[in-house]
């Protein structure tokens, strides 16, 4: 029995990198996972989880969209009956261009994903977690 047996987890940015690695580690310890990403890589992550015997569902969603965040949190609760962990891991960078060549629109997108995304995750997860 793993340390996270029976826990339900959402990880955003689960399509690659740290999000994928965390997804594999959490489910190896028995967590049930809703893996979220905008990229098709999230489906690969879920396949890897299932290959190691884990339970996971892929959700292609925008971690900076209020409607998407509310939706994937509600889906986790509907699927697993509860929500124990939300890891707002999704993030993007400014790229390698000098700042003088970057646009305000690009920086607004960075803030939407990296700052507003975690706020939305907590905002919509908290009521479920407090009830538990």
Describe these PLM feature segments.
Residues 60-72, 104:
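The beta1-alpha1 cofactor-binding region of Rossmann-like NAD(H)/NADP(H)-dependent oxidoreductases
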Residues 122-123:
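A short, exposed helix-loop element centered on a Lys and neighboring polar residues
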Residues 1-10:
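Flexible N-terminal pre-Rossmann segment of NAD(P)-dependent oxidoreductases
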Residues 15-16:
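Conserved glycine-rich cofactor-binding loop
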Residues 89-95:
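Conserved NAD(P)H cofactor-binding loop of Rossmann-fold oxidoreductase domains
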Residues 29-44:
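Conserved glycine-rich Rossmann-like NAD(P)H-binding loop of the short-chain dehydrogenase/reductase
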Residues 97-99, 106-108:
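Substrate-binding pocket helix/loop in short-chain dehydrogenase/reductase
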């Amino acid at each position: 029995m793993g340390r996270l047996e029976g826990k339900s987890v959402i990880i955003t940015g689960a399509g690659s990198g740290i999000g994928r690695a965390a997804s594999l580690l959490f489910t190896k310890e028995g967590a049930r996972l809703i893996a979220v990403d905008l990229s098709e890589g999230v489906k690969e992550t879920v396949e890897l989880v299932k290959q190691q015997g884990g339970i996971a569902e892929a959700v292609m969603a925008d971690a900076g969209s209020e409607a998407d965040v509310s939706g994937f949190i509600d889906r986790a609760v509907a699927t697993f009956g509860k929500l124990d962990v939300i890891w707002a891991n999704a993030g993007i960078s400014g790229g390698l261009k000098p700042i003088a060549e970057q646009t305000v629109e690009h920086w607004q997108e960075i803030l939407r994903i990296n700052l507003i995304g975690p706020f939305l995750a907590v905002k919509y997860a908290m009521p479920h977690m407090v009830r538990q």
